[in-house]
A protein has these predicted regions:
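Positively charged n-region of N-terminal signal peptides that target proteins for export
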Residues: 1-7
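A composition-driven surface/loop motif
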Residues: 7-518
Length: 518
């Protein structure tokens, strides 16, 4: 993420105003769970109203196979094929017809599809271990859709080498499990992917995961669906050097367990909808990143201006589930909006500016749910004034160490909300539907204890000691203060992670267009 210039633009605006700134386990998974998705030509649902990319087709939901389907029994460098539509050629399995193929056994080579544009290929993984040292394990470069079913009780493994051999002018496949078009994964079995060259799972259209226990270890991205990613009823564990789950479109998580033990950015998409599930993210960069797209031909100035814009169609929305983020940069970073409408969200952001726990270009509102974020004061933001659920913005004069519990108790000593921060912090945003206007609460963090009588909207304890934009507080003055107190003195210049002052550029003025790129 391009952070420094983004933050420096905010500093320049501040100087012009001359006032306070206002907010600008490594063990592979074998647990099985039961898939319960209704086949009704409508969206599978665990709640009364959820957001999804589209309808699930019968093919997406089909986990069935029979004795009449083609069987492919793999045996290291050979295969025994019973049925039509598949051949063993040049050390690989080639599938040439639409249909269902049941695969089992160990294999050194590649599964290739060469089917028609409208064909659907159903691959049933019934205990496979496929390794290809010179390319991807699965190369579905043709067909309308590939559906992979993980048979209950089986463990299936895909792995590749550290380099791929390509024909002249080619650069695909570029993932251990590569699908040129649409990909659906369903079933209750396990899938382990050891990705040593590029991404682990990649679909260049829509990617749907409706079940399974998936473990990914990748030197690059873990899961990429170019147009969209939808996840339900799956258990996914990720260790990735690059992004955990990413798409150039919409990411929707309706249920399941997602454990991103390591990634650059945890979840990344144009729009992110989290409607349920348990999501744990440890990221070296942003935890949750809702961002737009630029054409590759855009200039640096256009890209910088684009990053500063409120991208109206870009958002992060959480309506349910439990989300826990430990981020090396921004915990939440939205180039547009942030909507917290339910669920439980815990965010631990960076320990030094300009990265913060909550970062947005448009607005951030909370209307329901539980939310706690901790981070630094520099460039910090809190919720916008049009939030309908009460919240507290807390400033601390010195950093509190990692492992410090921040909690809110009512006048009877009952804990309303608590969170143990993964990193040191000097700033926190706390919200709960149990924070009642007119009631007095105690906010405790380490040796710090403050009482606050809740007013509708935003409430503040402590004073800011860092430069940069504060949050959009309530209009009655109870909201988070912006940057330094308005003493007439200019705010501190933004610094890099080492505390060095950053050079001030001229603010960009160019506009840019939002278009897809591969």
């Amino acid at each position: 993420m391009k952070k420094n210039k983004k933050k420096m633009c905010a500093w320049l605006i501040t100087m012009a105003l001359g006032l306070a700134i206002v907010g600008c386990s490594n063990a592979k998974m074998t647990t099985t769970t039961e898939t319960t998705i209704q086949q009704s030509k409508t969206t599978a649902t665990n709640t009364s109203s959820i957001t999804t990319v589209g309808e699930y087709s019968d093919e997406d939901l089909d986990t069935s196979y029979s004795d009449s389907d083609t069987k492919i029994e793999l045996s290291t460098g050979s295969a025994n094929i019973t049925g039509d539509g598949a051949t063993f050629e040049d050390g690989n399995i080639k599938i040439t017809k639409a249909g269902t193929y049941v695969l089992s056994g160990d294999f050194d080579g590649q599964i290739i599809t060469e089917v028609g544009d409208e064909d659907v290929v159903h691959l049933v993984f019934n205990g496979i271990n496929i390794t290809n040292t010179t390319s991807s394990a699965i190369n579905a470069a043709t067909g309308k859709k590939v559906v992979i079913t993980l048979v209950d009780g089986t463990t299936n493994t895909l792995s590749d080498g550290t380099s791929y051999e390509y024909a002249d002018g080619e650069d695909e496949p570029d993932a251990t499990l590569f699908v040129k078009n649409n990909l659906t994964i369903n079933g209750n079995g396990s899938l382990n992917i050891d990705s040593n060259f590029a991404a682990a799972i990649k679909s260049k259209d829509n990617l749907i995961i409706l079940g399974g226990n998936i473990y990914i270890d990748s030197v690059d991205k873990a899961i990429k669906g170019k147009d969209s990613v939808t996840i339900e009823n799956a258990n996914i564990t990720i260790n990735a050097e690059d992004d955990g789950i990413t798409t150039d479109g919409a990411l929707v998580i309706n249920s399941g367990n997602i454990n991103i033990e390591k990634a650059g950015e945890g979840l990344e998409a144009i729009t992110i909808d989290i409607n349920g599930g348990n999501i744990d993210i440890v990221a070296t960069d942003d935890g949750l990143n809702a961002r737009g797209l630029l054409d590759d031909s855009a200039s640096d100035e256009e890209k910088e201006a684009y990053g500063e814009e409120n991208q109206a169609d870009t958002y992060l929305k959480i309506t349910g589930g439990v989300v826990n983020v430990d981020a090396g940069a921004d915990g939440i970073d939205s180039n547009g909006q942030v909507y917290i409408e339910g669920g439980t969200v815990y965010i631990s952001g960076a320990t030094s500016g300009p990265d913060v726990a909550l970062d947005y270009n448009g607005e951030a509102t909370i209307t329901s749910g539980t939310f706690v974020s901790t981070g630094v004061q520099e460039m910090s933001q809190t919720f916008s004034s049009n939030s309908t659920q009460n919240f507290i913005t807390a400033y601390y004069s010195s950093a509190l160490e990692a492992g410090t519990e921040i909690k809110v108790t009512d006048k009877s000593g009952n804990v309303v909300v608590s969170y143990t921060a993964a990193k040191s912090f000097s700033f926190a945003v706390i919200s709960s539907d149990k924070l009642t206007a007119g009631e007095t609460y105690t906010v405790t963090a380490g040796d710090n204890s403050s009482e606050v009588t809740i007013a509708a909207g935003g409430n503040t304890i402590g004073e800011s000691t860092g430069g940069g934009p504060g949050g959009m507080g309530a209009p009655d003055g109870n909201g988070g203060p912006g940057g330094n107190p308005p003493t007439g003195e200019p705010p501190q210049k933004p610094t890099d992670a080492n505390g060095n002052e950053l050079e001030m550029p001229e603010p960009p003025s160019s506009n840019s267009s939002q278009t897809e790129k591969n």
